[in-house]
Regions:
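Short, small/acidic-rich helices and loops at N termini and domain boundaries
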Residues: 1-52
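Amphipathic alpha-helical transducer elements in NTP-driven molecular machines
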Residues: 12, 72, 132, 136, ...
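Short, conserved phosphate-binding/catalytic loop or strand-edge motifs used
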Residues: 19-24, 193-202, 236
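The Walker A/P-loop phosphate-binding site
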Residues: 49-142, 149
Length: 316
């Protein structure tokens, strides 16, 4: 229609203005990385004018008649492809070792907590805080068990680690580009990242909610592009006046609403050395995580289900 033609031309003029303004900046003193950020922000702000029905819109009757397939399990009964899982615990509880065990075991086709055989997947472990010797200690322990278990079928280079204890900033174009190159190379089905607070930099006077929204948008775009399931390790806020800590994500409340599963790991008063697996919010998906993680003789963590993996247990 004539109105659509006018709208398209107006949209084109706005894009041309943004590009002209950005060309002037390119001749200035802006760092190339900063220039990319500026241009991306400006182009994102230019609203498009839809001229056709969205391809993913349909009548509910037609939509219900279409086949809808659940994504495959990347960790049987615990996590499907594309899911977002946030694990919250106090410092030193053992969540880093747990996520390390998940990444290493899943890469060799071993269930991380009941240690049964399962289809192997490529994994990426992004550690932004722990010292190398701590990672090496548990990494060698788990890897030796997996090598003995798999023998000649051990999948070398199936699990990658990005160890950057200085942290990174997912809102920084250079850091994001590094991650994109790594994801392109590894093609992981599972990414374990933590701790979350070291994956971005909040500048002075920046709002927690706005920062969280931007970081979540980056993570969602990467998930959609590369098709991985994401496990984030996060800290809980400090308790008031020495009181018991609420096991909810530190910082923005968006971290409570964003994940498909929000899990907690809390020290078990009745079982010293064990962690009770709980939840800080209702989940959008159904999965079967252990009810408790117990310290193992060989494996760092061994999962406990009161009714067994297929019996009655903690069914989120």
């Amino acid at each position: 229609t004539y109105a659509e033609i006018v709208g398209r031309h107006a949209h084109t003029r706005r894009v041309m203005n943004v590009l002209a303004e950005s060309l002037e900046d390119a001749y200035g003193t802006l760092d190339p990385g900063a220039l990319v950020e500026v241009v991306t922000t400006r182009l994102t702000a230019v609203e498009g004018v839809p001229v056709e029905l969205p391809l993913d819109a349909d009548s509910i009757d037609e939509w219900l008649l279409q086949p809808h397939h659940e994504p495959p399990w990347v960790i049987p009964r615990m996590m499907r492809q594309g899911w977002r899982v946030v694990i919250v615990a106090a410092e030193g509880a053992g969540k880093s070792v747990a996520t390390r065990q998940i990444a290493l075991c899943a890469a060799q086709g071993v269930h991380p907590f009941d240690h049964s055989d399962c289809p192997p997947v490529n994994t990426l472990l992004i550690d932004l805080e722990n010292p190398g010797e701590a990672i090496k200690d548990t990494g060698e322990r788990i890897t030796s068990l997996l090598r003995a278990r798999r023998g000649n079928d051990y999948r070398a280079n199936a699990c990658w680690i990005w160890h950057r204890p200085s942290g990174l900033d997912l809102r920084n174009r250079r850091h994001r580009a590094e991650l994109e190159v790594l994801l392109e190379h590894v093609r992981p089905q599972v990414v374990c990242l933590g701790p979350l607070y070291r994956a971005f930099t909040r500048r002075s006077r920046e709002d927690h909610e706005a920062v969280a929204e931007q970081v979540q948008r980056v993570l969602d775009q990467l998930r959609a592009r590369f098709g991985f399931g994401l496990i984030l390790e996060h800290h809980a806020p400090k308790g008031l006046s020495g009181g018991k800590r609420d096991l909810v994500p530190f910082g923005s409340s968006l971290w409570q609403r964003w994940p498909d599963m929000g899990l907690t790991l809390e020290r078990d008063d009745d079982q010293p050395g064990s962690l009770v697996v709980g939840q800080y919010r209702g989940h959008r998906v159904r999965a079967r995580w252990p009810e408790r993680l117990d310290r193992g003789v060989g494996w760092p963590w061994v999962g406990f289900w009161s009714g067994g993996m297929t019996g009655v247990g903690l069914d989120f």
